[in-house]
């Protein structure tokens, strides 16, 4: 692992930002393949939903281990490995026509790839490179980069599917993973390990400390809700709109792109405000606002413009939880094991994602609509608002007495 005292923050943010832009941008567009793949192979929506659900679950399951690997071997090596797995997973999705192999193979490969290229993998180098007073802002920048990917890549993915074929679209995206991610990974240089401020701690002690700390468990619970909500909307929104009579695919593309566009601002300002306002209050505001936005969307007459307004509102709240959650973890436990601890919290997020993706398909297959899932989303928003209220950013005793 190449180490220097303090790498340039701008270089780190640009490099990790491009990695996140591509990793998250491609992943957010997987919903566009639901109907063409299901029709081509004669599958139900539940089959493709299970593949997406397993991807998210594996992403979360591998997350803590990817975090440990980052802390041990450095961000660059792990991102390179993740880029290779991402390309392999996309090719797998293009060539496999057996349902069981498609679900398990794509779930494991893409899930592993995302654990090595998304927030958990890059949070450590960002947290250790940015000065403490800029840390929340830096996390906001990285979260905004992932939203930029959603805004940029989703129209690209839809047009690749429309103007070539869904298989060719996978091949093109696999090539992009290698052409863009690999050079960016090689630009990442680790800051020297900082052992001041009570940061001498083994992995086992760090895990025990975190799981015995109530705010950490509250963050995990709230993040479960976040995962359930965003994945259900990202995976099932295109199909939901078609079911409701909005047949133009460009409406779904535009809506999901608007979510990405508005979350650039939402994530950036969430990170910026997190430096001056208690992050738990911002998290509570985000979750409660989601209930309001979803409720208004369901009550209003459905039209193209109501879809766009919903997308803009959800976009402001979409990944705004990420810089705040990572910032709280860094404030409480320090940055030595930040990638690993963020990975554990993110695992909870991905359990929610698994249920959001799979349950959407399961309940649709059983009842022919998504009404029950929208109701669950409303209730979970209120639950997450209450769960985040007691979360304190006060450092653990180990850091206070150092």
Feature map (PLM): residue ranges:
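Extracytoplasmic gate region of multi-pass secondary transporters
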Residues: 30-34, 214-268
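C-terminal transmembrane helical hairpin of 12-TM major facilitator-type secondary transporters
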Residues: 257-262, 276-328
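Flexible cytoplasmic inter-helical loops of multi-pass small-molecule transporters
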Residues: 186-205, 397-401
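Hydrophobic core of transmembrane alpha-helices in multi-pass small-molecule transporters
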Residues: 21, 101-117, 224, 306-320
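Cytoplasmic helix-loop-helix junction between adjacent transmembrane helices
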Residues: 106-144, 334
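Helix-to-loop junctions at the C-terminal end of transmembrane segments
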Residues: 62-75, 266-278, 364-365
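Helix-loop-helix hairpin linking two adjacent transmembrane segments in secondary transporters
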Residues: 142-190
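Conserved MFS/SLC helix-loop-helix module at the cytosolic interface between two early adjacent transmembrane helices
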Residues: 61-100
